[in-house]
Amino acid sequence: EGGTYGQLYASPNLIAANGTWRLPFRGYQRRHDFLRRGASYPEDGEFRWACWEPDRLAGIEAKAEGRVTLIERPCSGRELLLNFRTAPDGWIKAEIVQTIHTPPQPVEAHPGFSLAEAELLTGDSISEAARWQGQTDLSALAGENVALRFHLYKAKLFSVSI
């Protein structure tokens, strides 16, 4: 059951229970600045639980179409694994791009790992490999620093592993 609150006072510890992560909190309808606005102390609030699926506490979301580039990191040479969820008509595509420069400049995709070669990822997966023309192998990039550029449409990206 959802709710909307002006004030939240949360416990500092996540609790694992029934296959979810839970956080107890107390919510009040009044905003945090209620005293400055001349209001009295809030009436009794209510205790609730905020719940998350494991491994999905935070993520990047595109409610329509969006793009994000993550800073460079060493490539393991195995696969690019994604933890994501899309709407029924949503998708994600991944590119592996050259090292990002400062100040920012356009960067090109590594050959074989471009947007044009990327396959759509759809649905809901905790760990699915990105594919480029049916291939997932990144051994050609092993040990190189690469940046990752994701194109999302009605999708949430929770984590990546390269």
Question: What are these model-derived regions, one by one?
Answer:
Residues 1-162:
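Carbohydrate-active catalytic/glycan-binding domains of CAZyme proteins
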